Regions:
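Short, high-confidence coil segments that cap the C-terminus of an alpha-helix
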Residues: 7, 25-27, 194, 267-270
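C-terminal helical cap/extension that packs against the catalytic core
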Residues: 89-109, 174-177, 210-271
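Active-site-proximal loop/hinge segments that shape catalytic or ion-binding/gating pockets
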Residues: 277
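ATP-dependent carboxylate-amine ligase catalytic core
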Residues: 1-45, 63
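Phosphate- and divalent-cation-binding pockets in alpha/beta enzyme and binding domains
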Residues: 20, 38, 93-96, 185-188, ...
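Short, surface-exposed connector motifs at secondary-structure boundaries
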Residues: 76-84, 193-197, 218-221, 268
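Conserved catalytic-core segment of NTP-binding enzymes
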Residues: 35-39, 46-105
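Nucleotide phosphate-binding/pyrophosphate-handling subdomain across enzymes
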Residues: 23-33, 41-51, 56-59, 69, ...
Length: 288
């Protein structure tokens, strides 16, 4: 019967999730948009609060080829008289959110950035994520005391099983895995490393992912490899792009061989980053 409904896999999965939440009588359900917001299946939800973290170039084929167009689509989750928390800081985009929030009579909040919280997720972008989460807690007036907030932030991986966010696999040299898979995430991650770092990179075969190479610092060394997926970007395509933009690069047939060479080329005080796709993680987790 499901086949006759004409629903997508995501729509069916979302409906099942909502039913499950209802049967379990959860206090709060955190529902993440699949694509954009305005036309997403999840936008049927009547929320107590809406959250927009940041605006990147993900899925611009569907959402629009400018940040303003993408922001407009994401602002589609702002509901009438429902508060919204916005992590995005660029003034040009803030104007879009302010305009739509005013039209919907929705209170809008741009969180203050906190740097004094510790978390077991140690990526350079976690301060922003934590600040957004704290603002949501405040807006909902949840009875969570400071002690429990501090404790929860130190146990995110334990409580959620979330891995692959600035995950330190080994030391001397420092081996890091970070599943940065879009231009904005990669830029933040790479800017956190010192010159001369070795970057093992593999990704899916998507135009935006290949374009990511354009923001790669020329002061680093790149080890390109395929990912464990039928949709992997070919190493030849990555290397051709790297050659055009004058990166220092090497090509490999597997993540294992790329990583082995990166290790061989690194001194004990240097960094090795494996990034580009979550599909790489299953290969290197065995090294723990």
């Amino acid at each position: 019967k499901i086949e006759t409904l004409g629903l997508t896999y995501f729509e069916i999965s979302f409906a099942m999730a909502v039913y499950y939440f209802a049967t379990k009588k959860v206090d709060y359900a955190l529902v993440e948009v699949g694509l954009g917001g305005r036309l997403d299946a999840t936008n049927v939800v009547d929320p107590v609060i809406s959250v927009i973290t940041n605006i990147g170039y993900d899925h611009k084929k569907f959402l629009g080829n400018t940040f303003e167009k993408i922001a407009f689509e994401k602002a589609g989750i702002i509901k009438q008289n429902v508060p919204v928390v916005i992590g995005e800081k660029r003034n040009l985009l803030k104007k879009i959110f302010l305009k739509i929030a005013k039209e919907k009579s929705a209170s809008i909040n741009f969180p203050k950035l906190y740097h004094n919280y510790k978390s077991d997720l140690i990526g350079p972008y976690q301060s922003k994520n934590i600040s957004v989460a704290l603002c949501v807690i405040k807006q909902l007036d949840l009875e969570i005391n400071q002690k429990h907030i501090n404790s929860g932030l130190l146990r995110i991986k334990q409580n959620t099983k979330l891995f692959g966010r600035w995950e330190i696999i080994k030391k001397n040299p420092l081996l890091i895995f970070d599943a940065a898979h879009n231009i904005d995430a990669l830029k933040e991650t790479l800017n956190s490393l010192k010159p001369g770092s070795k970057i093992v990179f593999g990704t899916l075969d998507k135009k935006d992912q290949i374009k990511c190479l354009e923001i790669f610092p020329k002061s680093m060394f790149y080890y390109f490899c395929p990912v464990n997926s039928p949709r992997t970007a070919s190493v030849l395509k990555l290397c051709n792009k790297a050659k055009k933009i004058d990166l220092k690069y090497f090509c490999f047939e597997s993540v294992e061989s790329a990583l082995k060479t990166a290790y061989k080329d690194s001194k004990k005080n240097e960094n090795i980053l494996v990034t580009g796709s979550t599909f790489l993680f299953e290969n290197i987790i065995k090294l723990k």
